[in-house]
Swiss-Prot record:
Transmembrane segments: none annotated. This is Alpha-bisabolene synthase. SUPFAM superfamilies: Terpenoid cyclases/Protein prenyltransferases, Terpenoid synthases. Its cofactor is Mg(2+); Mn(2+). Mg(2+) 3 binds at D710, T714, E718. It catalyses: (2E,6E)-farnesyl diphosphate = (E,R)-alpha-bisabolene + diphosphate. The gene is TPS5. Binds 3 divalent metal cations per subunit. Can use either Mg(2+) or Mn(2+). Belongs to the terpene synthase family. Tpsd subfamily. It comes from Pseudolarix amabilis. The lineage of its organism: Eukaryota, Viridiplantae, Streptophyta, Embryophyta, Tracheophyta. Keywords: Lyase, Magnesium, Manganese, Metal-binding. InterPro entries: Isoprenoid_synthase_dom_sf, Terpene_cyclase-like_1_C, Terpene_cyclase_plant_C1, Terpene_synth_N, Terpene_synth_N_sf, Terpene_synthase-like, Terpene_synthase_metal-bd, Terpenoid_cyclase/PrenylTrfase. A motif (DDXXD motif) lies at residues 563-567.
Length: 814
């Protein structure tokens, strides 16, 4: 403090505190600070070195070029070859009537791309159903053109050696799409060509039975009138197709559900040829299993970039990708590509999730198209199967519910049950999805609510599970190299560590300030400087917001002393004087205060002035009076609670909540950060859209949620200290017949819709800088994490400590 050393303040304070003989003061018995000054200052990150920043900058440039190729195109996509589909295209005869293939380059590709074991497929990913389907398809194509005798022989040997083993992949999640439809059909064709294969295996008969059962459920008439998922596998149902009628459901691009194999199988008119010519012209000598996948690919790219925590580098590219998707969005849902007439649940759910997160106007009514008459959700219209990845996407989308969106509540309930069952199944299964880390994704998603999660921990965890070589299932195993690649992962890890290194330097500044601030002298209060830094830094983590983080942390540390002073240490007479001093905003009035309060008031006065002045510099208008009024309201709320305590008064729940929204202190804390965000101007009109006492906007909802979330985890400890007023106790006073468990359930019934309101306020389009809304929203998310499993501020050595280690202490190995 100016003119007085910290040492003399220490001596004076200790002397005067110990001289209050006969006065019994309550204490919260705070747990000690788990993050020592010496520990924080021992942190030394190598990622402060400029070479890491230079490498990250280079990666950003490389990825931007890659994204421009993927996102700025005209619907094209980058996808790995499908040997299965390429073989079908290779079978198309020349349109001039000569005895040669129309696309001879595909035959050459097949000859050159057989794997060492005699199979065809993606060498890096082995799935037996995929290899068998591709290999048999390639063998038939080569046999038809009487070429590649050696390759045919080796392919047949592979099929003979492995055909019986495919029964071990009989789990639906481990089979390529429509395997039970297509493979028996291919086997019949192979048998008609006298290819020597084991046609009488028990599993083959089982497959044929499954095929018949599935086809028995298909309306033959609907195949020709309504686009059906079976169009994707027409080559597997040639025995039931009326070829002159099937043209009625041909796509505008000439394809059948964007499938090169189906289209090559039909190959009746010039439109089929145009589609195949177009694909061959774009890709050269092979075709993929789907073309195009432009909607799904864009969504997956954006999703991965955001979950890896690197989205701030690619905002322009993300906006272009989502604009493209939104242009093709419709109330029926969307498929994996713009030319696909059938809506797909995974693509639709992911589209809804990302579009809503970016404040596009999308309605959850789209999911009514994916419900059957029993209220169960399925993956695509006309196909009543459920795919784990699709259900996971729907589960994630359901967490973005606004008030009144019952369909999303239904989706959340349904997918939670479905995913739990899938998880139990995966623990005893070697299913493909389990091998691809999907079970880890499910486990984490079910455990961690989006509303109660830490952005930096989420990014770190995703870096740990993200697979650059991730493959997906359709009729073939395929990869999307622009979606999963080494560059994304390297930048994700580098960026996390670089940001963490910046935060560690800021943590040293915070702990140095705290040590010298005088706040540690108040031994009755909790010391949580790092926890409060964590509260803001893990959501508003960008380097340019350092001042916002620092001042937010200062205010939070001050609030903790005030909280414990009003809650436990101060007498009612002392608190009345302190509250009056705050109201008067006059340092001379502090002469009436006890010595410990004099020091507290001086620290308070300096911090409030500092925050107000910094806000004025950032916003360009007078704000000292605004902050003074906010602090006055806040401490008056504290004082009212102190009066309740002194008189053993338990208010009604409504009275408690009205005061608690103010006394929780979240409003003034949030304003001490959001008004000091570098480059983010908040006009008075814009500010009132996120902060208006008594109106359910972001700061009000944050305060309500924080108050009630706090109560659900602290009311027992506070009751043991003699504090009778909590939302639980107040509800029980209003309803004497109810139990504690019923009161707690009622509080949660208030919390849940408030969280939906908060989500709506956060994501609705307006003229408030989105970075400011994000800061307010992210702080709420972290607050909910802190009170998820207990009082994370009061006892910060458990889950909160782990979150701090993950986000601020331990780097990601490169």
């Amino acid at each position: 403090m100016a003119g007085v050393s910290v040492e003399s303040k220490v001596s004076s304070l200790v002397c005067n505190l110990s001289s209050t003989s006969g006065l019994i003061r309550r204490t919260a018995n705070p747990h000690p600070n788990v993050w020592g000054y010496d520990f924080v200052h021992s942190l030394k990150s190598p990622y402060t070195d400029s070479s890491y920043r230079e490498r990250a900058d280079a990666l950003v440039v490389e990825i931007k070029a890659m994204l421009n190729a993927a996102i700025a195109g005209d619907g094209e996509s980058t996808i790995t070859p499908s040997a299965y589909d390429t073989a079908w295209v290779a079978r198309v005869p020349a349109i001039d009537g000569s005895a040669r293939p129309q696309f001879p380059q595909t035959v050459d590709w097949i000859l050159k791309n057989q794997l060492k074991d005699g199979s065809w497929g993606i060498e890096s990913h082995f799935l037996l159903s995929d290899r068998l389907l591709a290999t048999l398809s390639c063998v038939i194509a080569l046999f038809k053109w009487n070429v590649g005798d050696l390759q045919v022989k080796q392919g047949i040997e592979f099929i003979k050696s492995n055909l019986e083993l495919v029964k071990d992949e009989s789990d639906q999640d481990s089979l390529v799409t429509d395997f039970e439809i297509i493979f028996p059909s291919l086997l019949r064709e192979a048998q008609s060509l006298s290819l020597e294969l084991p046609y009488d295996l028990p599993y083959i008969h089982l497959l044929q039975t499954k095929r018949q059962e599935r086809l028995a459920k298909v309306s033959r008439e609907e195949i020709y009138t309504v686009p059906s998922p079976l169009l994707y596998s027409l080559e597997g149902i040639q025995d039931i197709v009326e070829w002159d009628r099937i043209m009625d459901v041909q796509g505008q691009d000439g394809s059948f559900l964007s499938s090169p194999a189906s289209t090559a199988c039909v190959f009746i008119d010039v439109k089929c040829l145009e589609f195949l010519n177009n694909v061959m012209m774009k890709l050269g000598n092979f075709v993929p299993c789907l073309y195009p996948v432009d909607l799904l690919e864009r969504l997956l790219i954006v999703d991965n970039i955001e979950r890896l925590g690197i989205y701030r580098h690619f905002e322009k590219e993300i906006n272009e990708a989502l604009d493209y998707v939104y242009r093709h969005w419709n109330e029926r849902g969307i498929g994996w590509g713009t030319r696909n007439p059938i809506a797909d649940l995974e693509t639709t759910a992911l589209g809804f999730l990302l579009l809503r997160l970016h404040r596009y106007n999308v309605s959850p009514a789209v999911f009514d198209n994916f419900k059957d008459s029993n209220g169960q959700f399925f993956c695509s219209t006309g196909q009543l199967n459920k795919d784990v990845a699709s259900m996971l996407s729907l589960y994630r989308a359901s967490q973005l519910a606004f008030p009144g969106e019952d369909i999303l509540d239904e989706a959340k309930s349904f997918t939670t049950k479905y995913l739990r069952e899938a998880l139990e199944k995966s623990e005893t299964s070697s299913a493909w999805n389990n091998k691809q880390n999907l079970s880890q994704e499910i486990k984490y998603a079910l455990k961690t609510s989006w509303h109660a999660s830490v952005a930096r921990v989420e990014a770190k965890r995703y870096c740990q599970v993200y697979r650059p070589d991730y493959a997906r299932l359709a009729k073939s195993v395929y990869r999307l190299p622009y979606v999963n690649n080494e560059k994304f992962l390297e930048l994700g890890k580098l960026d996390f560590n670089i940001i963490q290194a910046i935060h560690q330097e800021e943590m040293k500044t915070v702990t140095s300030w705290f040590r010298d601030s005088g706040l540690p002298l108040f031994t009755f209060a909790r010391e949580r400087p790092l926890e409060f830094y964590f509260l803001v830094a893990t959501g508003t983590y960008e380097p340019q917001y350092a001042k916002c983080r620092f001042l937010f942390t200062k205010v939070a540390c001050l609030q903790t002393v005030l909280d414990d002073m009003y809650d436990t240490y101060g007498t009612l007479d002392e608190l009345k004087l302190f509250t009056e001093a705050v109201r008067r905003w006059d340092l001379s009035f502090t002469e009436n205060l006890p010595d410990y309060m004099k020091l507290c008031y001086k620290i308070y006065y300096d911090i409030v002035h500092e925050v107000a002045w910094e806000a004025e510099k950032e916003q360009g208008r007078e704000l000292v009076s605004f902050f003074r009024k906010g602090w006055e309201d806040y401490l008056l709320g504290y004082y009212e609670e102190a009066e309740w305590l002194a008189s053993e008064y338990v208010p009604s729940l409504d009275e408690y909540i009205k005061n608690g929204i103010t006394s929780i202190g979240q409003r003034i804390l949030l304003l001490s950060g959001v008004l000091i965000m570098d480059g983010q101007l908040l006009s008075q009109e814009a500010l009132e859209k996120v902060d208006y006492p008594g109106r359910r906007v972001l700061t009000e909802l944050n305060s309500l949620i924080s108050r009630l979330a706090d109560d659900t985890k602290t009311y027992k400890a506070e009751k043991a200290r003699g504090e009778l007023a909590s939302s639980i106790e107040c509800y029980m006073k209003d309803h004497p017949e109810c139990t504690e468990e019923e009161a707690l359930a009622h509080i949660y019934s208030i919390l849940e819709p408030a969280v939906k309101e908060l989500t709506r306020e956060f994501l609705k389009p307006d003229d408030v800088p989105f970075a400011c809304k994000k800061m307010l929203f992210e702080e709420t998310r972290v607050t909910m994490v802190i009170f998820k499993d207990g009082d994370g501020f009061g006892v910060s050595k458990l889950e909160v400590k782990d979150h701090i280690k993950e986000s601020l202490i331990d780097p990601l190995p490169l």
